[in-house]
Amino acid sequence: MAKKKIVIGVIGSDCHTVGNKIIHNKLEESGFDVVNIGALSPQIDFINAALETNSDAIIVSSIYGYGELDCQGIREKCNEYGLKDILLYIGGNIGSSNEKWENTEKRFKEMGFDRIYKPGTPIEETIIDLKKDFKI
């Protein structure tokens, strides 16, 4: 079976790169083919990378607190560009620190994300979920 291909990157004006590189390395070590678009990436860069590489999933990372704004409409754009079945994950500091996590998670589910990870979630948890979702 061919390796599953995953686009990763840091959305919006967020420039954290260390965590992005760790995610990249851990995914590769786990047998995934990783397309890393890096930091400071708009939604369309994730979508174009997924289209150009025939990717199976997109993992969006955001630490700077504006992930919700940056991700508005991303599922609709994926659908519009023919990526209706692509897995869409997000993790990092994506909500208000004063808000209950369940509320943040609910909003991102409503935005069309398949999996949502709170700050500090080990990448190994994401890898387990990817394998479940890919049935591998």
Curated annotation (Swiss-Prot):
Presence of the UniProt keyword Metal-binding in the record: yes
Superkingdom of origin: Bacteria
GO MF terms, alphabetically ordered: cobalamin binding; metal ion binding; methylaspartate mutase activity
Pathway as given in its UniProt record: Amino-acid degradation; L-glutamate degradation via mesaconate pathway; acetate and pyruvate from L-glutamate: step 1/4
Cofactor(s) listed: adenosylcob(III)alamin
Its EC number(s): 5.4.99.1
Pfam families tied to this protein: B12-binding
Protein keywords: Cobalamin, Cobalt, Isomerase, Metal-binding
Binding site for adenosylcob(III)alamin: 13-17, 61-63
Gene3D superfamilies for the chain: Cobalamin-binding domain (3.40.50.280)
GO biological process: anaerobic glutamate catabolic process; glutamate catabolic process via L-citramalate
CDD domains, sorted: Glm_B12_BD
Enzyme class: isomerase
Subunit structure: Heterotetramer composed of 2 epsilon subunits (GlmE) and 2 sigma subunits (GlmS). GlmE exists as a homodimer and GlmS as a monomer.
NCBIfam families, A to Z: acid_CoA_mut_C (TIGR00640), MthylAspMutase (TIGR01501), PRK02261.1 (NF002612)
HAMAP family reported for this sequence: Me_Asp_mutase_S (MF_00526)
Described function: Catalyzes the carbon skeleton rearrangement of L-glutamate to L-threo-3-methylaspartate ((2S,3S)-3-methylaspartate).
Family the UniProt entry places it in: Belongs to the methylaspartate mutase GlmS subunit family.
Protein name according to UniProt: Glutamate mutase sigma subunit
Organism of derivation: Fusobacterium nucleatum subsp. nucleatum (strain ATCC 25586 / DSM 15643 / BCRC 10681 / CIP 101130 / JCM 8532 / KCTC 2640 / LMG 13131 / VPI 4355)
Gene expressing this chain: glmS
